[in-house]
Amino acid sequence: MATIIEMPELVLEKVIAFLDFKAVLTLRQVCHDFRNFIDDLNDSKLPDSKFQEIKFVSDDRRISFGLEESKKRFTCISYSKGQRSFCGKTEFFGYSNILNVAVRDMEMILKFQKTILERLQFEFHNVQLYGGSLVHTVPIKLSNMLQKLNRNVKTRTLSIKTNDPSPIMQILRFVDPGALKTIELSSLDGKMEIEIDEFAKTEQWKKADGIHCGFNVLNLNLEDICHFSSCSITLNSITAQELDFLRKTPQKTSDFSFFCVVLSLLHGLKNDFWTVDRYGKC
């Protein structure tokens, strides 16, 4: 009798079609032949992991990501001090491999994800990674992985928290603009300022319904936010003419729901909240 690895590829494909995401990942770890076979399979022949939310975090202690299947089912994978912890099991490896292992696992998860995510969140803390490598290499590795994936990630909401503006474009450009509804950008220390004009040129920005920026926005053309039905931004200053322009904008948008402008003062202090409803009333 032939062993499972000696079965014809068509038979193996049918076997995998009956398995769930975790079972295929387990099968992938059995031997190199299984791993290579699964890695070479067309994405359409892999089971859907059906996650609702994926959260990737890198800080001074670990790299981790959370996988939410439902409100009652949540899995956390953590990589720290040369080890990986998943469902109570720990695997040890060299310090230099922490980032590589984490990004490779993230690639596998996204490869299996066919259902549109409700939320994809990245959190990049400005700290040193094990081995002396700066953490800004994390979004670069992720960007390279997303490019290798050869398809855009489908999510309703993209959330990026960082103290460095560079990861935003590195991630944003690989999100499917047809699925994306809301962009959430935040500063971890509350001190970051970002020139937003380059982001506004992307299809993701142009097709999204909502934008929420938790940092000072520079070089903003107000016409670039007129299409949003929901918007929250922080500006250093705003003119009376610009305020009047924003006040009239909701009347031109049928599905407008919320607009908020926060004016910032020196030393990072916040001042003067300005909001408007769909009828242009402040």
Task: Go through the PLM ranges and name each one.
Residues 1-282:
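Non-core capping and flanking segments associated with repeat-based/extracellular domains
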